[in-house]
A protein has these predicted regions:
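Active-site glycine-rich loops that stabilize anionic/oxyanionic intermediates
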Residues: 56-61, 160
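The feature captures the conserved acid-bearing segment of alpha/beta-hydrolase catalytic domains
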Residues: 145-153, 158-167, 176-215, 219, ...
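Short amphipathic alpha-helix adjacent to the substrate-entry channel of hydrolases
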Residues: 64-81
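Primarily recognizes the serine-hydrolase "nucleophile elbow" in alpha/beta-hydrolase
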Residues: 106-169, 180-181
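Alpha/beta-hydrolase active-site loop
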Residues: 89-110
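C-terminal catalytic histidine-bearing segment of alpha/beta-hydrolase fold enzymes
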Residues: 215, 222-264
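N-terminal cap/lid segment of alpha/beta-hydrolase-fold proteins
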Residues: 12-46
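Short beta-strand element of the alpha/beta-hydrolase
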Residues: 48-57
Length: 264
């Protein structure tokens, strides 16, 4: 416990380092070589640190990795991930890249002072979708002999929980035609999942009924018996602006989860 207290209260005294463009998946494919990179931001003089893996947004069709300012100097390791994008690849390849980046983190994070039992996954919009999919559909991490339930928590910001609209578009399905198939986090609700913190913007300002999707996800997780699902609606903030206040919730929930005794 003393390390955790040090981590969050003495962060201003800590020296941080950033290493950019580490390869997390090897491939002969030029596009994979370009996109399967991550940046890691870590405190040099702390150990046993929590880690946040951050997936950028952009509708699965655009965007680039960056370390969110609100996650810096907080005593945590932050890993920002690029992944291959639609329509150059399939939705399965996007998800496979996300899983590979998480697997890399499990393998490597202790070298940077991290604790494999304190790995959280988060991201905004498309990044939130990837967060929920990899954390709930266990097959993606199983490929690396990792149990998705060993993640400390999933914290998607305004993530789609039905099948992603860009994936639907590639299959000739309209943006406003709801679809729930194997590529929808909702399809994979389960009792034994990691802690799930759902955060959206104002229901009247969000994209495509994003709040209502997440509210249904929250309800279904509760109904299947998941005991640690939370839902937050950030009033007065739309899809993009909700990210800034959402980081406060992320920090508070990480502290809560880390200070909650593990069930035997």
């Amino acid at each position: 416990m003393s390390v955790l207290i040090c981590t969050f209260t003495n962060a201003q005294e800590t020296v941080y380092k950033t290493i950019e463009n580490l390869t997390y998946a090897t491939s002969q494919d030029a596009y994979a070589q370009e996109r399967c990179k991550l940046d890691i931001y870590y405190p040099e003089n702390l150990k046993d640190c929590p880690t946040v893996i951050w997936f950028h947004g952009g509708g699965l069709t655009s965007g680039n990795k960056s370390i969110p300012t609100k996650l810096k100097k907080s005593g945590m390791i932050v890993i920002a991930v690029n992944y291959r994008l639609l329509p150059k690849v399939t939705i399965s390849e996007c998800l496979g890249d996300a899983a590979a980046a998480i697997a890399w983190t499990f393998k490597e994070v202790e070298k940077y002072g991290g604790n494999k039992k304190k790995i959280f996954v988060s991201g905004h919009s498309a990044g939130g979708y990837l967060t929920a999919m990899i954390g709930l559909d266990k097959k993606w991490l199983k490929e690396y002999s990792i149990d998705a339930d060993s993640l400390a928590g999933l914290i998607p910001f305004s993530g789609q929980v039905i099948s992603h609209f860009s994936y639907r578009k590639m299959n000739g399905i309209d943006n406003l035609q709801p679809t729930i198939d194997e590529f929808a986090p909702l399809f994979h609700v389960r009792k034994d999942a990691p802690s799930l913190i759902l955060i959206t913007g104002d229901r009247e300002l969000e994209l495509f009924g994003r709040y209502e999707e997440n509210a249904y996800m929250w309800r279904m997780m509760k109904l299947v018996g998941h005991e640690d699902t939370y839902l937050y609606e950030i009033g007065g903030h739309g899809h993009g602006p909700m990210g800034e206040p959402a980081f406060y919730i992320l920090h508070q929930q990480i502290k809560r989860i880390l200070n909650t005794p593990a069930k035997q």
